[in-house]
Amino acid sequence: MRALTLLALLALAALCIAGQAGAKPSGAESSKGAAFVSKQEGSEVVKRPRRYLYQWLGAPVPYPDTLEPRREVCELNPDCDELADHIGFQEAYRRFYGPV
């Protein structure tokens, strides 16, 4: 077992040394802004999907939740709120106030 561990460590060390030998030297030869790219180059690399079909309308407004008023009524009743935590809001509302 020790021999296997030693062999694995030696192989890892050899790979690290070989990787450093093939790497570019850092310093004067490396370009000044190698870590940063312009916005144009970045947008060519990362193509974002178009989110909205009609750009001139702007961002779509999220749809209003039709159950929100009922959810607030259920939250004001401690028993309904506790039951909603266990079985879900719609079922708790139905049991206390009738069909949703």
Curated annotation (Swiss-Prot):
GO terms, biological process: biomineral tissue development; bone development; brain development; cellular response to insulin stimulus; cognition; glucose homeostasis; learning or memory; negative regulation of bone development
Start and end residues of each Gla domain: 52-98
Query: What subcellular compartments does it reside in?
Result: Secreted
Q: Name the SMART domains for this protein.
A: GLA
Q: Where primarily located?
A: secreted
Q: Which residues form the propeptide?
A: 24-51
Superkingdom, natural source: Eukaryota
- Share the record's PTM remark: Gamma-carboxyglutamate residues are formed by vitamin K dependent carboxylation by GGCX. These residues are essential for the binding of calcium. Decarboxylation promotes the hormone activity.
* This protein's UniProt keywords: Biomineralization, Calcium, Cleavage on pair of basic residues, Disulfide bond, Gamma-carboxyglutamic acid, Hormone, Metal-binding, Secreted, Signal
> Which residue positions does the secretion signal occupy?
1-23
Q: Where does Ca(2+) 2 bind?
A: E72, E75
Work out whether the entry's keyword set contains Protein biosynthesis: no
> Which positions are annotated as binding Ca(2+) 1?
E68
List the InterPro entries.
GLA-like_dom_SF, GLA_domain, Osteocalcin, Osteocalcin/MGP
Disulfide links within the chain: C74-C80
Output one GO MF annotation.
Answer: calcium ion binding
As for what it does, the entry says: The carboxylated form is one of the main organic components of the bone matrix, which constitutes 1-2% of the total bone protein: it acts as a negative regulator of bone formation and is required to limit bone formation without impairing bone resorption or mineralization. The carboxylated form binds strongly to apatite and calcium. The uncarboxylated form acts as a hormone secreted by osteoblasts, which regulates different cellular processes, such as energy metabolism, male fertility and brain development. Regulates of energy metabolism by acting as a hormone favoring pancreatic beta-cell proliferation, insulin secretion and sensitivity and energy expenditure.
Similarity section: Belongs to the osteocalcin/matrix Gla protein family.
Q: What is this protein called?
A: Osteocalcin
List the taxonomic lineage: Eukaryota, Metazoa, Chordata, Craniata, Vertebrata
